[in-house]
Every structure is written in structure tokens, then in C-alpha cells.
Amino acid sequence: MKHLIPLIVMASVVLAVYADRGYGGGRRGGGYGGGGYGGGGGGYGGGGGGYGGGVGGGRGGGGGLGGGRGGGGGVIDGKDDVGLGGGGYGGGLGGGQGGGGGLGGGQGGGGGLGGGRGGGGYGGGGGGYGGGKYGGGKYGRK
């Protein structure tokens, strides 16, 4: 069992590197804040983002130690389109899913260190390390 821990950590780091190269993801949406109008959450070493990014959201990327994802959603044509966008997917250690839909998009994924619920306000979902109350909303990156 002790031999598996380094392998898991190494695999998580690799996932984080690939996620950082994803569609608008990586550290731009990572850390404590969620992502703008439907962007991805972060996570400790994780990569977020979303295919749609910005307006309309899209799906968030996963991966990394303490991962967990922010969701989509956002504003389309100046309206609060609840239900559009959608959740992301987890990956690595402490995965989880982000919520989507509408202005401020649903809830962030739990799991990882300091997980819990993100989302709220204009931000996307939180999750992973430093998630929870810091995921999106007031602390979300615009």
C-alpha cells in the first residue's frame, strides 16, 4: 500500500499538467476562486476551465491532486439561462463534480482538501483544495 501512494501522486501531477493545457483551463481558473461566467473551478494542483469558457460555460476539465471541477452555465444573450452549460467531471485525488446552469451556475464539486460547495454569484464551481466558500461568487474570477 505504501508503494501505491507515490504512484498516485505522480499520476495526479501528470493529470494536472495535461489539464493545465486544456480548453481555457489550468491555473487561470484554479486556486480559491471559481471561473467567471461559467468557467471551471480549480483545486490544489488541478486544472479547470471549460470548453465554452466565459459566456455559456461548458464542461470543466478535471485532474490533479485535490481536483474537483467547476461547472458551466453563465449568461447567454443577456438572459439568465438556467440549466445550460452543465457539470464538469472529477479526476485525480479528491475528485468531484461541479454544478451548472444559469447565472452563477449551481454548486461546485466536493472532495479533496477543503472541499465542499462552490458556485454562487457570478462564479463557477469550486472544489478541491480551497474550495467550498471560496469557490466562485464573490471570490470568483471574472
Swiss-Prot record:
<keyword id="KW-0027">Amidation</keyword>
<dbReference type="GO" id="GO:0045087">
    <property type="term" value="P:innate immune response"/>
</dbReference>
<dbReference type="GO" id="GO:0042742">
    <property type="term" value="P:defense response to bacterium"/>
</dbReference>
<keyword id="KW-0929">Antimicrobial</keyword>
<keyword id="KW-0399">Innate immunity</keyword>
<comment type="similarity">
    <text>Belongs to the glycine-rich peptide family.</text>
</comment>
<dbReference type="GO" id="GO:0005576">
    <property type="term" value="C:extracellular region"/>
</dbReference>
<protein>
    <recommendedName>
        <fullName>Ctenidin-3</fullName>
    </recommendedName>
</protein>
<keyword id="KW-0732">Signal</keyword>
<feature type="modified residue" description="Tyrosine amide">
    <location>
        <position position="139"/>
    </location>
</feature>
<keyword id="KW-0391">Immunity</keyword>
<feature type="signal peptide">
    <location>
        <begin position="1"/>
        <end position="19"/>
    </location>
</feature>
<keyword id="KW-0964">Secreted</keyword>
<comment type="function">
    <text>Antimicrobial protein with bacteriostatic activity against the Gram-negative bacterium E.coli, and very weak activity against the Gram-positive bacterium S.aureus. Lacks activity against the yeast C.albicans.</text>
</comment>
<keyword id="KW-0044">Antibiotic</keyword>
